[in-house]
Protein backbone atom coordinates (compact mmCIF):
# COMPACT_ATOMS: atom_id res chain seq x y z
CA UNK A 1 0.00 0.00 0.00
CA UNK A 2 2.92 2.34 0.67
CA UNK A 3 4.20 2.04 -2.91
CA UNK A 4 0.74 3.01 -4.23
CA UNK A 5 0.70 6.09 -2.00
CA UNK A 6 4.21 7.04 -3.12
CA UNK A 7 3.26 6.71 -6.78
CA UNK A 8 0.11 8.79 -6.26
CA UNK A 9 2.12 11.46 -4.44
CA UNK A 10 4.74 11.47 -7.20
CA UNK A 11 2.06 11.84 -9.90
CA UNK A 12 0.45 14.69 -7.97
CA UNK A 13 3.82 16.46 -7.70
CA UNK A 14 4.44 16.07 -11.44
CA UNK A 15 0.98 17.45 -12.24
CA UNK A 16 1.51 20.45 -9.97
CA UNK A 17 4.92 21.21 -11.46
CA UNK A 18 3.58 20.90 -14.98
CA UNK A 19 0.69 23.23 -14.22
CA UNK A 20 3.12 25.87 -12.92
CA UNK A 21 5.19 26.09 -16.08
CA UNK A 22 4.12 28.73 -18.56
CA UNK A 23 2.99 27.50 -21.95
CA UNK A 24 2.36 29.40 -25.18
CA UNK A 25 -1.28 30.24 -25.81
CA UNK A 26 -2.92 31.48 -28.97
CA UNK A 27 -6.37 32.93 -29.47
CA UNK A 28 -8.03 33.10 -32.87
CA UNK A 29 -10.74 35.73 -32.75
CA UNK A 30 -11.42 35.59 -36.48
CA UNK A 31 -10.25 33.93 -39.67
CA UNK A 32 -7.98 36.03 -41.85
CA UNK A 33 -10.02 37.30 -44.78
CA UNK A 34 -8.84 35.27 -47.83
CA UNK A 35 -9.60 38.25 -50.10
CA UNK A 36 -6.96 40.42 -48.41
CA UNK A 37 -3.91 41.50 -50.37
CA UNK A 38 -0.98 40.07 -48.41
CA UNK A 39 1.68 41.99 -50.30
CA UNK A 40 2.82 43.82 -47.15
CA UNK A 41 2.27 43.19 -43.46
CA UNK A 42 3.57 45.97 -41.24
CA UNK A 43 5.23 45.29 -37.91
CA UNK A 44 5.14 47.89 -35.15
CA UNK A 45 8.25 47.84 -32.91
CA UNK A 46 7.47 45.85 -29.78
CA UNK A 47 7.02 47.62 -26.47
CA UNK A 48 9.76 46.17 -24.26
CA UNK A 49 8.83 47.22 -20.72
CA UNK A 50 11.29 46.31 -17.97
CA UNK A 51 13.47 44.42 -20.43
CA UNK A 52 17.15 45.26 -20.97
CA UNK A 53 17.53 47.09 -24.35
CA UNK A 54 20.36 44.76 -25.36
CA UNK A 55 17.87 41.90 -24.97
CA UNK A 56 14.60 43.29 -26.39
CA UNK A 57 15.91 45.01 -29.53
CA UNK A 58 17.68 41.94 -30.99
CA UNK A 59 14.57 39.80 -30.39
CA UNK A 60 12.46 42.13 -32.51
CA UNK A 61 15.07 42.23 -35.30
CA UNK A 62 15.43 38.43 -35.30
CA UNK A 63 11.64 38.02 -35.30
CA UNK A 64 11.30 40.17 -38.43
CA UNK A 65 14.26 38.43 -40.11
CA UNK A 66 12.69 35.00 -39.50
CA UNK A 67 9.33 36.17 -40.88
CA UNK A 68 10.93 37.55 -44.04
CA UNK A 69 13.08 34.45 -44.51
CA UNK A 70 9.98 32.23 -44.32
CA UNK A 71 7.43 34.54 -45.97
CA UNK A 72 6.92 32.23 -48.97
CA UNK A 73 5.22 29.75 -46.64
CA UNK A 74 2.64 32.40 -45.82
CA UNK A 75 1.96 33.99 -49.23
CA UNK A 76 3.03 37.35 -47.73
CA UNK A 77 5.09 39.52 -50.07
CA UNK A 78 7.11 41.14 -47.30
CA UNK A 79 7.07 42.09 -43.65
CA UNK A 80 7.99 45.75 -43.14
CA UNK A 81 9.01 47.39 -39.87
CA UNK A 82 7.24 50.65 -39.08
CA UNK A 83 9.87 53.09 -37.87
CA UNK A 84 7.57 54.80 -35.36
CA UNK A 85 6.08 53.59 -32.11
CA UNK A 86 2.40 52.64 -32.33
CA UNK A 87 1.24 55.88 -30.68
CA UNK A 88 3.12 57.92 -33.33
CA UNK A 89 1.55 56.18 -36.35
CA UNK A 90 -1.34 57.98 -38.04
CA UNK A 91 -4.46 56.03 -36.91
CA UNK A 92 -6.36 56.69 -40.17
CA UNK A 93 -3.53 55.09 -42.16
CA UNK A 94 -2.92 52.21 -39.74
CA UNK A 95 -6.56 51.09 -39.66
CA UNK A 96 -6.31 50.38 -43.41
CA UNK A 97 -3.32 48.04 -43.01
CA UNK A 98 -2.61 44.49 -41.93
CA UNK A 99 -0.19 44.84 -39.06
CA UNK A 100 1.41 43.11 -36.09
CA UNK A 101 2.13 44.70 -32.73
CA UNK A 102 3.41 43.20 -29.52
CA UNK A 103 5.13 43.49 -26.17
CA UNK A 104 8.01 41.84 -24.36
CA UNK A 105 7.96 42.04 -20.58
CA UNK A 106 8.63 40.21 -17.35
CA UNK A 107 12.32 39.54 -17.94
CA UNK A 108 13.75 37.88 -14.83
CA UNK A 109 17.16 36.38 -14.08
CA UNK A 110 17.46 34.42 -10.86
CA UNK A 111 21.07 33.48 -10.20
CA UNK A 112 22.49 31.30 -7.49
CA UNK A 113 26.03 30.18 -6.87
CA UNK A 114 26.05 27.62 -9.65
CA UNK A 115 23.12 28.23 -11.99
CA UNK A 116 20.73 30.81 -13.41
CA UNK A 117 17.05 30.59 -14.28
CA UNK A 118 15.85 33.07 -16.93
CA UNK A 119 12.26 33.94 -17.86
CA UNK A 120 10.59 36.36 -20.25
CA UNK A 121 7.06 36.84 -21.56
CA UNK A 122 5.77 38.20 -24.83
CA UNK A 123 2.49 38.79 -26.56
CA UNK A 124 1.73 39.69 -30.15
CA UNK A 125 -1.39 40.78 -32.00
CA UNK A 126 -2.39 40.54 -35.67
CA UNK A 127 -4.84 43.13 -37.00
CA UNK A 128 -6.86 43.20 -40.23
CA UNK A 129 -7.74 46.40 -42.08
CA UNK A 130 -10.77 48.14 -40.63
CA UNK A 131 -10.67 46.31 -37.29
CA UNK A 132 -9.75 47.84 -33.95
CA UNK A 133 -9.51 44.46 -32.24
CA UNK A 134 -6.94 41.82 -33.17
CA UNK A 135 -8.00 38.77 -35.14
CA UNK A 136 -5.17 36.78 -33.54
CA UNK A 137 -3.25 36.93 -30.27
CA UNK A 138 -0.30 34.85 -29.09
CA UNK A 139 1.12 34.72 -25.56
CA UNK A 140 4.65 33.31 -25.60
CA UNK A 141 6.53 32.74 -22.33
CA UNK A 142 10.05 31.34 -22.51
CA UNK A 143 12.07 29.88 -19.66
CA UNK A 144 15.70 28.82 -19.68
CA UNK A 145 18.05 27.32 -17.11
CA UNK A 146 21.81 26.85 -17.27
CA UNK A 147 24.78 25.88 -15.11
CA UNK A 148 27.49 28.52 -14.69
CA UNK A 149 30.26 26.00 -15.32
CA UNK A 150 28.86 25.31 -18.82
CA UNK A 151 28.07 28.82 -20.06
CA UNK A 152 27.79 32.50 -19.12
CA UNK A 153 24.83 34.86 -18.75
CA UNK A 154 25.52 36.85 -21.94
CA UNK A 155 25.55 33.70 -24.09
CA UNK A 156 22.45 32.25 -22.47
CA UNK A 157 20.59 35.58 -22.62
CA UNK A 158 21.24 35.57 -26.37
CA UNK A 159 20.01 31.96 -26.58
CA UNK A 160 16.82 32.86 -24.67
CA UNK A 161 16.22 35.80 -27.03
CA UNK A 162 16.67 33.64 -30.13
CA UNK A 163 14.20 31.10 -28.75
CA UNK A 164 11.63 33.82 -28.07
CA UNK A 165 12.06 35.33 -31.55
CA UNK A 166 11.65 31.87 -33.11
CA UNK A 167 8.53 31.08 -31.07
CA UNK A 168 6.93 34.44 -31.91
CA UNK A 169 7.67 34.03 -35.62
CA UNK A 170 6.37 30.46 -35.59
CA UNK A 171 3.03 31.63 -34.12
CA UNK A 172 2.62 34.23 -36.89
CA UNK A 173 3.69 31.83 -39.65
CA UNK A 174 1.26 29.19 -38.40
CA UNK A 175 -1.60 31.73 -38.44
CA UNK A 176 -0.75 33.03 -41.92
CA UNK A 177 -0.02 29.70 -43.62
CA UNK A 178 -2.87 28.71 -45.94
Give residue ranges: language-model regions.
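Bacterial N-terminal signal peptides that target proteins for export
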Residues: 1-9
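Bacterial N-terminal signal peptides
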Residues: 8-18
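A structural "domain/chain start" motif
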Residues: 18-72, 169-178
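Extracytoplasmic/periplasmic, Sec-exported soluble proteins
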Residues: 51-59, 112, 116-118, 152-164
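Short beta-strand->alpha-helix linker/helix-N-cap micro-motif
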Residues: 68-93
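Surface-exposed short loop/turn segments
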Residues: 84-135, 144-151, 155
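C-terminal partner/receptor-binding element of secreted or periplasmic proteins
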Residues: 147-178
Amino acid sequence: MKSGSCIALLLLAVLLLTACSAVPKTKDYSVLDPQLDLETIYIVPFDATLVPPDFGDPIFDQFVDILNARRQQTKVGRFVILKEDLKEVEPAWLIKQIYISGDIWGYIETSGCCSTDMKVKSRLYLYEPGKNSPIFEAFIPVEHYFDHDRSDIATERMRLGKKLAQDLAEAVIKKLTP
